[in-house]
């Protein structure tokens, strides 16, 4: 007897994510286990979509600082002060748990300059004794690296070639305008998602 249930195509899930953090690393090539190197995360934002770009979930958490204060330059850039983070923030562990739960259901992880954010979150997972390898093993796409030729912004390097485009530069190239709220992780990731699907339509990612 023929089954009355037709096979349904299960939609792939994509997770787009971005972080804001307390300063910059000394060494961008350091392992995620080099806890002295990678700055502390102060905001984590992510969007889960299906493969057509329909948003299934949007989340943004300010992280409550434990054992550090947010430096002034970062507070000015992100508008996240130590005081605000202590009032509005949630614990690092609860933010990471929720993010990793959503990540476990995703087929692909996307970010702009994704290796930086993978290292920031990976190091925080390591600090918390959580499974950072699960994050690093997930298939990922970097909209910065994949759009370098498309943006064709000349590099200042003596070797020539193109420089890696900032998210604002990619957004301007695709849509003719910049976006509001740069240096807020949620605004950045909303722009990254928009850019990713526009690049996908053009066959660039």
Label each PLM-derived region with a short phrase:
Residues 86-105:
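Catalytic-core regions of hydrolytic enzymes
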Residues 2-7, 12-14, 27, 38-82, ...:
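Metal-dependent phosphoesterase core characteristic of DEDDh/y 3'-5' exonuclease domains
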